[in-house]
Amino acid sequence: MNILLLDGGKDFGHSHGELNHTLHKKAKEVLTALGHNVKETVIDAGYDVEAEIEKFLWMDAVIWQMPGWWMHEPWTVKKYIDEVLTAGHGKLYHSDGRHRVNPTEGYGTGGLLQGKKHMLSLTWNAPIEAFTREGDFFEGKGVDAVYMPFHKLNEFIG
């Protein structure tokens, strides 16, 4: 399997991104040992937008390794998404999926990466109960509810 590893760890403030960098390196080591083809990007180290588009076209699955910052991905990961996906118009997606005949239907179905998979590997300074327990901070909705927009962006392109 062709796997794209995206390391969203960031050295900022009191966080140095070391845990995410370590998990990223371990994933690369394990996946390579298992016989997978791996390409990677350490987002904070910089990237070439066109090369990233080609990596998305190449991959069968992408693993996003990143910390939870203020209930979202770090701003550098958001910038990466905005730059790469916008430049990928025509290669990663052709439109938002709607048609002139009925513009109220089909939104989110214009992705060109059908059959590709994604996985989030997330680090938080929060116990799992903060996400899963009723009455706690995330009201028992779970981690995937916090990241629903992130899952949808991956679904949008594929």
Residues of each region from the PLM?
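N-terminal beta1-alpha1 ligand-phosphate binding loop
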Residues: M1-L34
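Hydrophobic/aromatic beta-strand patches that form the interior of the parallel beta-sheet core
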Residues: L4-L6, K39-T41, I63, M119-S121
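Flexible, glycine-rich phosphate/dinucleotide-binding loops
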Residues: F12-G13, Y47, P127
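Short, solvent-exposed amphipathic alpha-helices that sit
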Residues: L19-E29, K141-I157
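A short, structured loop/turn motif at beta-sheet edges
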Residues: T32, L113-G115, F156-I157
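A short beta-strand-loop structural module common to alpha/beta enzyme folds
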Residues: L34-Y47
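Residue-level detector of anion-binding/catalytic polar loops
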Residues: N37, V62, G158
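Helix-loop-strand module that forms the ligand-binding subsite of alpha/beta enzymes
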Residues: E50-F150
